[in-house]
A protein has these predicted regions:
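Non-lumenal N-terminal regulatory segments of integral membrane proteins
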Residues: 1-111, 213, 227-230, 242, ...
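Hydrophobic core segments of alpha-helical transmembrane domains in multi-pass membrane proteins
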Residues: 33, 46-55, 132-133, 151, ...
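Hydrophobic alpha-helical transmembrane segments
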Residues: 40, 47-77, 89-181, 211-212, ...
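Alpha-helical transmembrane segments
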Residues: 59, 373, 437-441, 467, ...
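Juxtamembrane/interface segments at transmembrane-helix termini
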Residues: 63-67, 159, 447-450, 454, ...
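Structural signature of FAD isoalloxazine-binding scaffolds in flavoprotein oxidoreductases
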Residues: 72, 76, 278-282, 297-298
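Membrane-embedded transport module
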Residues: 90, 99-108, 115, 132, ...
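Cytosolic catalytic headpiece
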Residues: 102, 125, 130, 171-285, ...
Length: 533
């Protein structure tokens, strides 16, 4: 009887996991490109689809294994049902990554179509134009970045599993890192809380609130009877003045969580009872012990597999690690995408020759993007998280993209001035792109430690050696003395000019923020007091 009743639930959960991980705009566009190339019998150009398949398989595999782990431990704890967090509200990292990929695809698809039509007008075969356009889209939309971010999240999820915490989905790992307030249901907390854990949470900058269903300790100076709260103003005043609430029922707990969110907090909720379900559902991050009520476990993003909350500080740090690594990885890949987009656009509008082929982009990118991103994606970075993922990635990637574009355009112009041949121009551009890529890598890896310093030094040596060893296969030739001097000068100035690019982007960003504030603020005298405006 129980097996028959559970079968539809398992099918529903499997359908949800497949839909959540497969039915994304990124996967749909990549699948359409792959099918198009298959129809054109261009199997050699399907390399970009393998990271997409690996990423989808990794996410689906983790989500299903997490459900199985939660289901197993809950059945040992007396649960008859199979819990799973089914809330469709995406996490900050997941939503930001999806929006960023949509923006890149929104830019890449029209640009690739424009380039394809231009090739057809100039006499190229339609099949070749379509294959070239598909390659443009694949190069502008970094599928490898998505795979590396998922792999980094998986490492963090495994670290949490060692501490007896299971994330209901792969992207749930990051949720607790965004929170600056944690609400505890004291009915569950009193049995297993430790003062050291609560002290560590406070040290990490988290404000703690406690909800009691009965009378709390009268000696506590910060106690509020939740039964006396009626209006939103009373709730707003209460969360600012008190941290302990007695006689808090389910409605009161949900209202208090909502009021904390309205006050600008990102709220995590730890609860195990039926009366916690509404507050858990409303919280930005829901945590529940495995032996909690079914209605509470169903809302959990993170399930505690032991009767303690000692793993909460570790969950905060692992979430920060996941977000910081994803941001660092995104900077490297988005920098290349922005640079490629600008160069493709200039090649179409101004009719400048495109500086390098996809082979040369891949070759230099292997040492300045791919290998460093793999290493940095698994680094332990526990700095607090600030801002939003998309804005942080684009803001940090913009200086590197600006330096790359400036260097490649300068290489093309100097090649014309010096009268270099097409082979010499290609060599000039490859060397300029290598210098810019290494400068960006050295800048991104600050502050330096042994790992980052060794990584940057190793990539510099390997790229320099590879350019010499594979110069024949890459089509590189010797430059005349003037060209060699120009390349040497660009190489020496690359790192200082990267700092100049950062300053330019900072000033532009500050000007944009000030203009936005001027539009929002109509009261005279307010803008003069705003820093930087």
């Amino acid at each position: 009887m129980h097996t028959n009743a559970a079968a539809p639930d398992r099918a529903h959960r499997l359908t949800y996991v497949l839909y959540d991980n497969l039915a994304t705009p990124f996967n749909c566009v990549m699948l359409a490109l792959a099918l198009l190339l298959l129809a054109l019998d261009a199997h050699a150009d399907l390399w970009f689809f393998f990271p997409v398949l690996l990423n989808a398989g990794l996410r689906i595999g983790y989500d299903l294994s997490a459900q199985h782990a939660i289901r197993s431990v809950c059945s040992r704890g007396g649960q008859r049902t199979e819990p799973l967090s089914m809330r469709r509200r995406p996490t900050e990292l997941k939503a930001g990554l999806s929006h960023m990929l949509v923006v890149l695809m929104f830019v890449a698809v029209p640009l690739a179509a424009w380039k394809g039509f231009a090739l057809v007008r100039h006499g190229s075969a339609p099949r070749e134009a379509v294959i070239y356009a598909a390659g443009m889209i694949a190069s502008l939309v970094p599928a490898a970045m998505v795979l590396l971010i998922s792999a980094s999240l998986l490492i963090c999820a495994r670290e949490l599993r060692k501490r007896r915490v299971v994330a209901a989905s792969l992207y749930s790992v990051e949720l607790l890192a965004h929170c600056d307030a944690v609400c505890f249901s004291s009915d569950a907390l009193d049995a297993f809380a430790e003062s050291k854990t609560l002290s560590r949470l406070r040290e990490e900058g988290l404000a703690l609130y406690f909800f009691h269903s009965t009378e709390a300790d009268a000696s506590d100076p910060f106690i509020c009877d939740a039964r006396t709260l009626r209006t939103p103003d009373e709730y707003s005043s209460a969360v600012q003045a008190f941290s302990v609430f007695s006689h808090a029922g389910g409605a009161e707990r949900a209202a208090l969580v909502q009021e904390l969110q309205a006050a600008g907090h990102t709220v995590a909720m730890v609860g195990s009872l039926d009366i916690d379900a509404a507050a858990l559902h409303r919280a930005d991050c829901a945590l529940c012990p495995y032996n909690g009520a079914r209605s509470a476990v169903l809302q959990a993003h993170l399930v505690l597999l032991s009767d303690t909350v000692n793993a909460l500080p570790a969950a905060v740090l692992e979430g920060r690690r996941a977000i910081n690594n994803a941001t660092r990885t995104g900077e490297l890949f988005v920098k290349k995408s922005l640079c490629s987009f600008v160069l493709y656009l200039l090649a179409l509008i101004v009719r400048l020759p495109y500086p390098m082929t996809q082979l040369h982009w891949s070759f230099t990118g292997a040492f300045t993007v791919i290998i460093p991103a793999i290493v940095l994606a698994f680094e332990r970075q526990y700095q607090p998280v600030h801002g939003r993922f998309v804005s942080n990635v684009f803001y940090e990637a913009a200086p590197g993209a600006l330096l790359h574009v400036a260097y490649l355009l300068l290489a093309v112009l100097l090649s014309r001035v010096l009268g270099l041949t097409s082979e010499m121009r290609l060599t000039f551009c490859v060397l300029a792109a290598s210098a810019a890529g290494l400068a960006v890598l050295w800048h991104i890896c600050r502050p330096y430690d042994r790992l980052r310093t060794g990584l940057c030094a190793l990539m510099t040596l390997l790229l320099s050696a590879a350019l010499v060893l594979f110069r024949g296969r890459l089509g590189l030739v010797d430059l005349p003395p003037a060209g060699a001097y120009a390349v040497s000068l660009l190489g020496m100035l690359a790192y200082p000019l990267q700092h100049v690019s950062v300053r330019i982007v900072e000033r532009v960003g500050r000007a944009v923020r000030c203009r936005g504030k001027k539009r929002r603020l109509a009261v005279p005298g307010l803008l003069e007091r705003d820093e930087g405006c």
